[in-house]
Amino acid sequence: MAKKSLRVKQARPQKFKVRAYNRCLRCGRPHGYMRKFGLCRICFRELAYKGELPGIVKASW
């Protein structure tokens, strides 16, 4: 419940620009956020593993 209220709170326009922060679009996690994809590291890893993110491949060298 707390996470849902924080997602709603974050979505509202902030009175001050400094208060704005990014949240994962999928799960709402505020930390480990990747701007390029709009996802947290955990959701990014899950989707990349399933092959649902185009152009993302596992590194091998």
Swiss-Prot record:
Asked whether the keyword Protein transport is assigned, the reply is no
Q: Write down the HAMAP family for this protein, in alphabetical order.
A: Ribosomal_uS14_2_B
Q: Which Pfam families match?
A: Ribosomal_S14
UniProt cross-references to PANTHER family, sorted A to Z? 30S RIBOSOMAL PROTEIN S14, SMALL RIBOSOMAL SUBUNIT PROTEIN US14M
Q: Which superkingdom does the taxonomy of this entry point to?
A: Bacteria
- Cofactor: record remark: Binds 1 zinc ion per subunit.
The record's keywords, sorted A to Z, are: Metal-binding, Ribonucleoprotein, Ribosomal protein, RNA-binding, rRNA-binding, Zinc
* InterPro entries, alphabetized: Ribosomal_uS14, Ribosomal_uS14_bact, Ribosomal_uS14_CS, Ribosomal_uS14_sf
Under which name does UniProt file this protein? Small ribosomal subunit protein uS14
Q: Which residues bind Zn(2+)?
A: C24, C27, C40, C43
Record GO biological process:
translation
- What organism does this protein naturally occur in? Moorella thermoacetica (strain ATCC 39073 / JCM 9320)
- So what does this one do? Binds 16S rRNA, required for the assembly of 30S particles and may also be responsible for determining the conformation of the 16S rRNA at the A site.
Spell out the molecular function terms from Gene Ontology.
Answer: rRNA binding; structural constituent of ribosome; zinc ion binding
